[in-house]
């Protein structure tokens, strides 16, 4: 600095000229000095600083000039110059401030020029103008001048660039206002005024400056907005006048003015803006538009947004002069619009935002200000035209332009919502609404909302919730504008052609939301009444509905006079009749709302009115209806009108009389009038009620109240009952709805009287009621009769006699004969050896240890020895004759013998030791097993055959859990089966081995597979036809246990799928081999056998050795061929059950048809390829006769057998047996065929009769019995005699030789049964009184033959046959191995179900069980039968009838085409479903019903049911759980699991049917969870497994309002209900979600989404705490929004019902997560969703992905302005700002930079980022006061263009 010292010293000289020269010299030296002494050197810098910091103004002034010259000449760097001047400015004296500001201004202009108008700064604080302003307050005056100079000097470079340069400075100036003193505010105003002045001076370059100022408006504090707007408007006025005058930029300046008005109103009409005086702002904006209009500019459609903002401001305003100002503005806009010459009808409709003004303007008509009323009326007259235009052009799609801003405003949201409501009938909505989400998604009222939901219903729910909150917190209230805006929407919708009525209902709801709306609503009613009365309005029909709104307004006490005053003019005597009648009804409804109106109503309803207006039908009816309402709602008030009631009853007008009777009925119901006293007075007016259905209905409604005092007035009560019965039973009346209603009323009235009283007054009351029910076809009447019948049944049960338990006495001669058979055949005193009657001995001999003493083991050995010796004798003498039929009968007999042997052993062990039941059974069975094996080792061939059968019988009689015994027996029999050299061992061992396989335990897979594999091996390899046939029978037995269990039955070491696959492969081998072998024996083509083989493709293990040549009939071995083929056919027939379970129903039908075709003389019934061969028929006929009953029995159970087939097949058997009996030609085949046909015919007929499905002709039964009698009494071989006897026994149900199906013991026929002439019989013959008498001689004859010792062989067969029948009849008494806890079921049935004949239960039961019951009529229709079943389902007890057969017949009956169907029966109610429900109700009492349910719920049978019955069964899983055993329930749950899994891929069901079935399954599982306790862990595990499988196929819940989503809604509803009842620990574990990764194969993304949705729904219902849902926040909000949209909605719906603290925490957490999430849009959208559903504007918001973000400008700002959310506003805005910076950086940087700097934001967010930034920026600006200034400046610096 030394080199400059001299010159610097001269600056101190107090001489200005010397000082200036010194400064010039210093800077000249700096300019020319070498580098070490230049301006950049330390000496140079010090010299400059010295000059600038001088106290002399002259020095400083010259120094600033010289410094600027250095910079201008590029000697000094610009930044250095700015720095020097800025530093000097900050430390200078205030009088020097202007010098430095001028210098800085000059340098700034130079810098801008050098950068060609593109001078940018990295932060607002570094902006030179900002630095100047920030330095000190004194700079403001000169700074304004420099800014103006800057603009004027640099405008040549482009005004747009100049404005961009100044924008940060302008924003800084505005943002500093709230943080500094008033001078900042003043400076800001002056700055804006200065720039506005520049616009005036540079009119052609003014538009960019205007846009700059408009962009800054959003940062201006509200109290400064008024002045700023006035400045801008004034400047705009100058500019627009000039530009329009010159014709330049007219369009741009026009649009700019509209944008200015819109932008200012957008700020004023924002939800977060507090209500302030905005009158001057509105006036300024109006002035701007007035200038445009004066200049001839056209009305812009963009002004529709201005109107929307004014609508909101008008609704929100409470200040009169502000309201008046807005009205004037609106009036100006509307006039301008209507004056536009180019406004067409379509344009008016397209811009019909004005229609929203209707209700707010109408509301202002109640203002006390005359000026407001005048202005409002003017606006209303113009709006009316728009409204009429819209109503006449409803299909013109309405839309509004949103201009440049995509952000929503309250007005646009309301208008958009109104548009969608208006067009919802013309366009399918693609969006839902938040109201729907809040109140119909999993709420307690969800069932109500399944299907289309109207805004009206949702708004009503919203209003109810509002009042609930109001009750909890008195301070809770809605903003003033909400009900007004709701009214604005409803007011427009009133004019809708089809939705007007709903809109009027909405107005009623709005009145309930805010009591202050009553007067506006009254005015709206008056206005619309006037409007709708005009001819040019197409909605005149709504007038009455609109007037109906008046009474609802009377809820407010102050409104009563106004409402009554409004109605009163319509009650003038000169008023029109219809108007007068309407007024009466309105007055009545007003009284309903408020009792203060009663005096006015009573005056109108005086009795004289009926005389005065006798010719005015409408008025009389209106008066009567009002009297009726009063009596119904307030009986005490009704007493005051009793004379008017009497006047109604005395009227000649039937409707008036009817209403009078109904009014009196309500008074009697309330007991304010005595019924019989009143009846004495008015009964003369009820004499002709049968002429008018309405009158009959009303009188019956009255007469039911006579029940209370009927005993006190018996004569009058009897007359009343006669009237009711006459009307209720009058079936001759026309079948119209009115008479139906009358009859129902009469029957319901009868139900009010005591049953005992009616029985005393009516003879045969029960019989008449039953006849009426069975004769009726109308569904409504049937329902009423059901209730009456149920009441009668309950009464009968309550007064029933207590029957004394008596010793059971055989009820018929047949039973007496059967009881004495053992004593007669094996008398104690005679030496009749067991060996002579071996068959009977097996069934009759019994040795009981009568002398057993405790601790004695001798008795056990004695009894065991007795049985062993008897068995030795039997096996030696019982000849099977290589006859498979005899073998099966012997096996059946041996099973009964083994059961008695075991029981005797167990009883003996009981007396000697105290062991467990299972141990006793095992010990007893081991002893028998040892004896049998010991005997078998050295047995002769005949004995060996029987011993092999005995082993099978022993195992079949054992419990399934006896593993060891069955395994040992199987091993022993397998060894015999594989001894090909011992044929006598092989064939019976094969049969027994199959029988054992069918009775193995569920876990004995290995043993079962070994047994079947052995049978298949021998079937393929044996050269003996008999052995092949026996193996076929054994395989048929084995099939009974194939595919009967699902995966839950698989053991732990065998995979469930592989286990079932093994069984399916085994079944395939069995059917394929049997079909192939039969086809080989047939030697002729057979399409069915070939198709059966094709259904089960061959495997590598099948290798059938060449079939032996069939021998001639005369050959000795011909029997082997006959019975061998018969065995194969029987085996094939036995396999139908397994084939059906495998899902091959068609194969079952083919087998049935094939076997039928092999019966001789059956060709006319079924034609099958290959059946014409005589050889085939002869050889295959024996087996087909024996196999057919098995196949038909199964087909009956699964409904594959039609009624018309019964008579045809029975006819075939009759023809066959008749021919065999007539032709006495001897021959082995005829002998065997005669035996087989008799056995088969008897078994078939017995099966059909016992099932009870198909009635059989009486003559057919008689003819068959006669043929059987001829067979066993004629000169035929003994085996033929045996066949005839077995035919008789089988007809009675014994099922001789049929080990697959057994029939329940027949019930004794009713003691008082009448012998009526009948042509058909259904049910067991021994349960039929007629046939019991017919059969007694037949049984006696066989009984006598069994006593005849002349022919030992015939005696043997007769004794055996009669013993089989005896065993069958005693089957209920000996079904258990031990007598522990054994109850006598027969006694229970005969006593506990002993129901008198005259009772209602018995009459109904007879009508259903007996098709020929006289009361039933002919024929019964489905509706009648279903009603009878419903009645009996409620019966406390049922008579002891054959209910199993009845239910099966009814199940089949509905599917028959000849059954009449009542047209009134609802389609969703089916007879088959009622059969199921009836069975479920009484299955615990009747085993046959339990068996029916067991069959129906078998998986294969269940799959074949119709969808409605499947749904019914699934819905009642809980009921089945109450009656099924534990093991059966396990299997049922496994079957349900399999069905659920297979349902998804089943193509036979439609999507709706699948959904319906899943819904039913959810309902059923819910029932099961209710029935299941915590201790039932096994059931719970099974149920939870079903729930998991159902949940896996549950569709992801969607909020789409489409109709195809209704199934999903129902599924979710039931699923959530079910999950609510599940155990908490399992539920939390099941719904646990660790992460969400779409596309990751290791995770089930869709399943996880459903779990989250389920958890949200459960949280909404309170079943799961919100803390559980909160654990998933981070996981959910870090996913892409498109993947989890529905999940977000579900969570928001749940949070809507949460406490406020939970909502606020979710709001904060969501926006915080957006700061780090890779998908920030998801979190922000969630914030938008949550804000939408929680804010006040929720009723107007649509749930649409495209609008949720844009609506956040309304929803979030509204929510954060709520006082309850103010506590979280600051942290929310802080996190939102952080997220905004992150997303803004991502959106504005290049892809490469964004990947590095934006913290892992996914690239998929790039398209959403601009909108995200815009929304977040708006919210941050709106709540900028919660941010520090530096963040506000960065906020303002963000480029939002």
From Swiss-Prot:
Intracellular or extracellular location(s): Cell membrane; Cytoplasm, Cytosol
UniProt keyword Cell membrane, yes or no: yes
A Pfam family reported for this protein in Swiss-Prot or TrEMBL: DUF3730
Keyword vocabulary terms for this entry: Cell membrane, Cytoplasm, Lipid metabolism, Membrane, Plant defense, Transmembrane, Transmembrane helix
Top-rank lineage group of the source organism: Eukaryota
Coiled-coil positions: none
Transmembrane portions of the chain: 250-270, 296-316, 347-367, 479-499, 513-533, 546-566, 943-963, 982-1002, 1123-1143, 1175-1195, 1229-1249, 1277-1297, 1719-1739
Any one Gene Ontology BP term: alkane biosynthetic process
Disordered as annotated region, ranges: 1374-1393
GO cellular component, one term: cytosol
Membrane topology designation: Multi-pass membrane protein
Effect of loss of the gene: Shrunken non viable seeds due to arrested embryo development when homozygous. Alteration in cuticular waxes with elevated amounts of cutin monomers in leaves. Susceptibility to the obligate biotrophic fungus E.cichoracearum and increased resistance to the necrotrophic fungi B.cinerea and A.brassicicola.
Tissue: Expressed in the vasculature of leaves, petioles and hypocotyls, anthers of mature flowers and siliques. Expressed at low levels in roots and stems.
InterPro entries: ARM-type_fold, FOCAD/RST1_DUF3730, Focadhesin/RST1
Function field: Involved in cuticular wax formation. Required for the synthesis of alkanes from wax precursors. May play a role in acyl-CoA reduction to aldehydes. Is repressed by FREE1 and functions downstream of FREE1 to negatively regulate multivesicular body (MVB) biogenesis and vacuolar transport. Together with CER16/RIPR, acts as a cofactor of the cytoplasmic exosome and connects the cytosolic RNA exosome to the SKI complex. Acts as a post-transcriptional gene silencing (PTGS) suppressor.
Quaternary structure and partners: Interacts with CER16/RIPR.
Record protein name field: Protein RST1
Organism of this sequence: Arabidopsis thaliana (Mouse-ear cress)
């Amino acid at each position: 600095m030394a080199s400059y010292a001299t010159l610097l010293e001269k600056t101190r000289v107090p001489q200005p000229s010397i000082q200036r020269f010194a400064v010039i010299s210093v800077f000249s030296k700096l300019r020319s000095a070498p580098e070490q002494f230049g301006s950049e050197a330390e000496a140079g810098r010090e010299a400059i600083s010295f000059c600038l910091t001088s106290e002399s103004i002259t020095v400083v002034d010259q120094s600033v000039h010289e410094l600027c010259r250095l910079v201008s000449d590029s000697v000094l760097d610009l930044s250095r110059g700015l720095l020097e001047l800025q530093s000097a400015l900050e430390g200078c004296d205030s009088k020097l401030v202007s010098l430095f500001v001028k210098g800085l201004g000059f340098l700034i202009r130079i810098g801008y020029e050098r950068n060609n108008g593109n001078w940018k700064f990295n932060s607002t604080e570094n902006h030179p103008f900002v630095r100047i302003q920030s330095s000190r307050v004194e700079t403001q005056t000169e700074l304004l001048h420099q800014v103006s100079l800057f603009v004027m000097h640099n405008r040549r470079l482009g005004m747009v660039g100049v404005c961009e340069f100044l924008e940060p400075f302008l924003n800084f100036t505005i943002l500093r206002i709230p943080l500094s003193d008033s001078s900042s505010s003043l400076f800001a105003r002056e700055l804006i005024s200065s720039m506005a002045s520049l616009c005036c001076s540079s009119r052609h370059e003014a538009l960019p400056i205007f846009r700059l100022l408009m962009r800054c408006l959003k940062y201006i504090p509200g109290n400064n907005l008024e002045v700023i707007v006035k400045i801008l408007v004034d400047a705009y006025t100058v500019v627009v006048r000039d530009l329009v005058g010159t014709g330049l930029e007219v369009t741009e300046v026009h649009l700019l003015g509209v944008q200015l008005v819109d932008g200012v109103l957008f700020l004023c009409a924002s939800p977060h803006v507090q209500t302030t005086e905005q009158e001057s702002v509105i006036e300024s904006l109006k002035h701007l538009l007035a200038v445009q209009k004066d200049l001839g500019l056209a009305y812009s459609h963009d002004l529709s947004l201005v109107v929307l903002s004014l609508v909101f401001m008008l609704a929100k305003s409470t200040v009169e002069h502000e309201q008046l100002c807005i009205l004037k503005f609106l009036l100006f806009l509307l006039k301008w619009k209507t004056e536009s010459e180019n406004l067409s009808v379509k344009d008016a409709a397209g811009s019909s935002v004005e229609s929203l003004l209707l209700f707010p303007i109408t509301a202002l008509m109640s203002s006390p200000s005359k000026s407001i009323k005048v202005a409002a009326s003017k606006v209303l007259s113009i709006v009316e035209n728009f409204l009429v235009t819209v109503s006449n052009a409803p299909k013109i799609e309405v839309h509004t332009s949103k201009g440049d801003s995509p952000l929503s405003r309250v007005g646009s949201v309301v208008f958009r919502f109104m548009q969608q409501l208006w067009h919802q009938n013309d366009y399918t909505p693609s969006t839902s609404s938040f109201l729907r989400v809040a109140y119909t998604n999993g709420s307690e009222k969800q069932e109500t909302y399944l299907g289309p939901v109207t805004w009206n219903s949702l708004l009503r729910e919203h209003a109810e919730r509002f009042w609930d909150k109001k009750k909890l917190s008195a301070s809770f209230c809605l903003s003033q504008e909400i009900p007004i805006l709701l009214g604005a929407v409803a007011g427009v919708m009133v004019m809708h052609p089809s939705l007007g009525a709903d809109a009027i209902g909405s107005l009623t709801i709005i009145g309930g939301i805010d009591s202050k709306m009553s007067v506006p609503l009254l005015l709206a009613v008056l206005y619309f009444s006037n409007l709708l009365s005009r001819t040019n309005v197409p909605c005149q029909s709504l007038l009455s509905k609109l007037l109906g709104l008046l009474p609802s307004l009377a809820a407010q006490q102050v409104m009563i006079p106004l409402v009554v005053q409004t109605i009163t003019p319509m009650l003038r005597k000169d008023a029109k009749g219809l108007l007068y009648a309407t007024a009466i009804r309105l007055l009545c409804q007003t009284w309903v709302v408020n009792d203060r109106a009663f005096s006015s109503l009573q005056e109108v309803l005086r009795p004289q009115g009926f005389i005065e207006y006798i010719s005015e039908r409408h008025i009389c009816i209106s008066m009567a209806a009002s009297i009726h309402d009063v009596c119904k709602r307030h009986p005490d008030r009704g007493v005051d009108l009793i004379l008017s009631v009497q006047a109604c009853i005395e009227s000649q007008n039937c409707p008036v009389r009817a209403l009078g009777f109904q009014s009196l009925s309500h008074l009697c119901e309330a007991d304010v009038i005595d019924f019989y006293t009143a009846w004495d007075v008015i009964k003369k007016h009820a004499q002709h009620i049968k002429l008018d259905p309405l009158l009959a209905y009303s009188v019956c409604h009255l007469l039911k109240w006579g029940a209370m005092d009927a005993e006190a007035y018996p004569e009058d009560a009897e007359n009343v009952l006669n009237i009711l019965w006459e009307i209720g039973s009058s079936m001759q009346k026309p079948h119209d709805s009115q008479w139906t209603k009358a009859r129902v009323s009469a029957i319901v009235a009868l139900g009010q009287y005591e049953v005992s009283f009616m029985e005393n007054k009516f003879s045969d009351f029960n019989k008449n009621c039953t006849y009426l029910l069975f004769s009726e076809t109308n569904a409504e009447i049937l329902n009423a009769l059901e209730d009456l019948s149920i009441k009668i049944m309950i009464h009968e049960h309550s007064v029933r006699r207590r029957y004394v338990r008596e010793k059971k006495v055989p009820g018929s001669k047949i039973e007496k004969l059967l009881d004495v058979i053992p004593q007669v055949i094996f008398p104690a005193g005679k030496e009749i050896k067991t060996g002579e009657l071996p068959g009977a001995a097996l069934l009759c001999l019994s040795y009981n240890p009568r002398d057993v003493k405790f601790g004695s083991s001798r008795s056990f050995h004695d009894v065991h020895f007795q049985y062993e010796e008897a068995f030795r004798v039997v096996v030696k003498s019982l000849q099977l004759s290589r006859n498979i039929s005899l073998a099966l009968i012997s096996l059946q007999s041996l099973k009964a013998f083994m059961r008695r042997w075991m029981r005797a052993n167990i009883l003996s062990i009981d007396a000697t030791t105290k062991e467990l039941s299972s141990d006793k059974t095992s010990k007893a069975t081991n002893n028998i097993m040892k004896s049998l094996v010991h005997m078998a080792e050295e047995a002769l061939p005949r004995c060996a055959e029987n011993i092999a059968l005995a082993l099978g019988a022993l195992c079949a009689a054992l419990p399934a859990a006896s593993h060891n015994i069955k395994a040992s027996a199987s091993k022993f029999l397998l060894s015999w089966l594989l001894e090909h050299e011992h044929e006598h061992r092989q064939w019976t061992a094969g049969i027994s081995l199959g029988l054992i396989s069918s009775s193995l335990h569920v876990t004995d897979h290995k043993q079962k597979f070994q047994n079947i594999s052995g049978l298949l091996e021998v079937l393929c390899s044996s050269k003996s036809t008999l052995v092949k046939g026996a193996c076929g029978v054994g395989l048929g037995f084995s099939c009974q246990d194939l595919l009967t269990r699902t995966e839950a039955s698989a053991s732990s070491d065998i995979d469930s799928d592989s286990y079932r696959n093994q069984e399916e492969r085994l079944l395939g081998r069995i059917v394929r081999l049997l079909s192939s072998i039969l086809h080989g024996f047939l030697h002729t083509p057979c399409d069915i056998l070939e198709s059966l083989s094709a259904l089960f493709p061959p495997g590598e293990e099948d290798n059938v050795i060449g079939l032996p040549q069939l021998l001639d009939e005369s050959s000795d071995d011909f029997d082997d061929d006959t019975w061998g083929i018969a065995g194969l056919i029987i085996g094939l027939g036995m396999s139908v059950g397994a084939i059906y379970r495998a899902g091959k129903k068609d194969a079952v039908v083919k087998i049935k048809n094939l076997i039928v075709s092999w019966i001789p003389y059956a060709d006319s019934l079924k034609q099958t390829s290959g059946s014409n061969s005589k050889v085939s028929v002869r050889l295959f006929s024996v087996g087909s006769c024996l196999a057919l009953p098995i196949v038909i029995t199964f087909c009956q159970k699964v409904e594959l057998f039609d009624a018309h087939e019964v008579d045809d097949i029975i006819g075939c058997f009759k023809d066959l047996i008749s021919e065999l009996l007539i032709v006495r030609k001897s021959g082995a085949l005829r002998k065997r065929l005669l035996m087989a046909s008799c056995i088969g015919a008897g078994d078939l007929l017995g099966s059909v009769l016992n099932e009870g499905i198909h009635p059989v002709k009486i003559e057919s039964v008689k003819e068959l019995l006669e043929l059987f009698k001829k067979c066993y009494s004629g000169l035929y071989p003994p085996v033929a005699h045996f066949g005839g006897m077995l035919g008789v026994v089988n007809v009675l149900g014994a099922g001789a030789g049929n080990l697959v199906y057994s029939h329940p013991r027949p019930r004794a026929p009713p003691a008082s049964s009448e012998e009526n002439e009948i042509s058909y019989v259904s049910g067991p013959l021994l349960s039929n009184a007629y046939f019991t008498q017919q059969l007694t001689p037949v049984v006696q004859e066989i009984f006598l033959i069994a006593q005849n010792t002349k022919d030992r062989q015939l005696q043997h067969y007769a004794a055996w046959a009669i013993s089989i029948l005896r065993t069958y009849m005693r089957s209920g008494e000996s079904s258990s191995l031990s007598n522990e806890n054994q109850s006598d079921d027969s006694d229970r049935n005969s006593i506990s179900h002993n129901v008198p004949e005259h009772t209602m239960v018995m009459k109904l039961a007879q009508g259903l069980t007996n098709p020929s019951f006289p009361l039933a009529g002919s024929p019964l229709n489905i509706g009648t039968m279903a009603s009878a079943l419903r009645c009996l389902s409620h019966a406390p007890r049922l008579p002891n009838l054959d209910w199993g057969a009845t239910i099966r017949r009814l199940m089949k009956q509905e599917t028959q085409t000849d059954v009449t169907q009542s047209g009134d029966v609802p389609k969703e109610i089916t007879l088959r479903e009622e059969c199921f429900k009836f069975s479920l109700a009484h299955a615990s009492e009747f085993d046959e019903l339990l068996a029916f349910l067991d069959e129906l719920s078998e998986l294969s049978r269940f799959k074949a049911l119709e969808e409605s019955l499947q749904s019914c069964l699934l819905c009642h899983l809980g009921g089945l759980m109450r009656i099924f055993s534990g093991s059966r329930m396990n299997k049922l749950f496994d079957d349900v699991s399999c069905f659920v899994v297979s349902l998804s891929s089943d193509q036979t069901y439609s999507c709706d049917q699948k959904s319906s079935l899943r819904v039913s399954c959810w309902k059923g599982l819910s029932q099961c969870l209710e029935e299941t306790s915590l201790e039932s862990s096994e059931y719970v595990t099974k149920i939870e497994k079903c729930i998991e499988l159902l949940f896996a196929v549950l569709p992801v819940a969607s909020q789409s309002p489409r109709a195809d989503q209704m199934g999903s809604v129902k599924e979710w509803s039931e699923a959530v209900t079910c999950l609510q009842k599940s155990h908490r620990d399992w539920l939390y574990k099941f719904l646990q979600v660790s992460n969400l990764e779409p596309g990751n194969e290791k995770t089930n993304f869709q399943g996880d989404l459903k779990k989250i949705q389920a958890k949200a729904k459960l949280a909404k219902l309170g079943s799961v705490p919100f803390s559980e849902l909160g654990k998933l926040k981070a996981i959910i909000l870090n996913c892409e929004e498109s993947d989890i949209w529905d999940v977000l909605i579900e969570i928001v719906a749940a949070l809507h019902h949460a406490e406020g603290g939970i909502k606020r925490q979710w709001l904060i957490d969501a926006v915080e997560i957006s700061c780090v999430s890779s998908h920030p849009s998801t979190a922000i959208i969630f914030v938008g969703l949550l804000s939408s559903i929680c804010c006040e504007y929720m009723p107007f918001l649509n749930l649409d992905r495209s609008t949720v973000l844009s609506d956040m400008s309304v929803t979030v700002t509204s929510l954060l302005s709520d006082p309850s959310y103010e506590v979280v506003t600051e942290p929310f805005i802080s996190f939102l700002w952080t997220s905004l910076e992150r997303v803004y950086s991502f959106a504005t940087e290049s892809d490469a930079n964004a990947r590095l700097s934006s913290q892992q934001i996914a690239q998929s967010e790039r398209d959403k980022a601009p909108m995200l930034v815009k929304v977040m920026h708006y919210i941050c600006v709106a709540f900028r006061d919660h941010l520090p200034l530096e963040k506000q400046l960065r906020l303002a610096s963000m480029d939002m263009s």
